[in-house]
């Protein structure tokens, strides 16, 4: 489990330290007023430039429980009044990073809320795109309310002492087939696997090359520099597969998805001691055309036994999705589906600005008819 002090400062320490091997990103400090906005009920978005403050079409009052009356819409206030400097800083940062970014709070990205985005992805072009994802995400809500539930020291932490930041990364399109999740225990890379749970046949022919590239990256960049000895990290290894990029870092905790492993496996995996791993491995070298044995070797049975007893170098376990894996048939299920709303709501969100409003009206009508039917049934009884 992560240490509280390390967990608090992860985002502050890791971004500048690993800038050379991560996608371009910026940190935006978040004041208490903005955190209160994220925790508040309902999804009220600030007005776009030139617009009047109003309810977002993506919300239409559904999530706040408000009625869709014109009076309520007109009375809606700009929620960014108390954190206008932060709003403007986010606008500037988006522009600085090329107009498209992917957001993340200290420890979690709102990946479970991408269904709310018009692109069905983490790509955000405006501050309101970011706010919509953050306020719709169970992952972000957990970070705000239960950030330290899975730390080694679960003592209470004053929210005012937690330096919350919004991490905005320049949006780049990644090939999901060469994204990998890596698991570090006691500063040892013990396992890695695909992040995208689909079968990619070409990965098997280059499994050793990919593992060596990630192992070398970890030894050089992370092993002795990351503040916590136990953590997971995600990497991207694009063609020609010799350059490794650090995409994300996550806590060694149950809420981090182990993907092709289980947490019990990772916690109990047999790993050799560092001293044992660093012992000299004897290699037998042979010249072309020779048997690789000297006269002394041929006369010494003890030496023959030693040559047969060559130690193997331990390597982290690397799991890929196999074509015939029976569990792979379930991989087509959308990620984070447990965090999403019913299909009717999702479909409505894809119909443009009026889709959610129309669905809200249909929902209210269905509720009214159901209530009317219950009343009639009660009178009949």
Swiss-Prot record:
Keyword line: Cell cycle, Cell division, Cytoplasm
Coiled coil segments of this chain: none
MF terms in GO: ATP binding; magnesium ion binding; protein folding chaperone
Superkingdom assignment: Eukaryota
Cellular localisation: Cytoplasm
Biological process (GO), any one: cell division
Broad class of the protein's primary localization: cytoplasm
Location of the region described as Disordered in the Swiss-Prot/TrEMBL record: 48-79, 279-309
Regions of compositional bias (Acidic residues) in chain numbering: 300-309
One GO cellular component term noted in the UniProt record for this chain: cytoplasm
Cross-referenced InterPro entries: CDC123
PANTHER family: CELL DIVISION CYCLE PROTEIN 123 HOMOLOG (PTHR15323:SF6), D123 PROTEIN (PTHR15323)
Family: Belongs to the CDC123 family.
Role played: Regulates the cell cycle in a nutrient dependent manner.
The name this protein goes by in its record: Cell division cycle protein 123
Species of origin: Phaeosphaeria nodorum (strain SN15 / ATCC MYA-4574 / FGSC 10173)
Taxonomic path: Eukaryota, Fungi, Dikarya, Ascomycota, Pezizomycotina
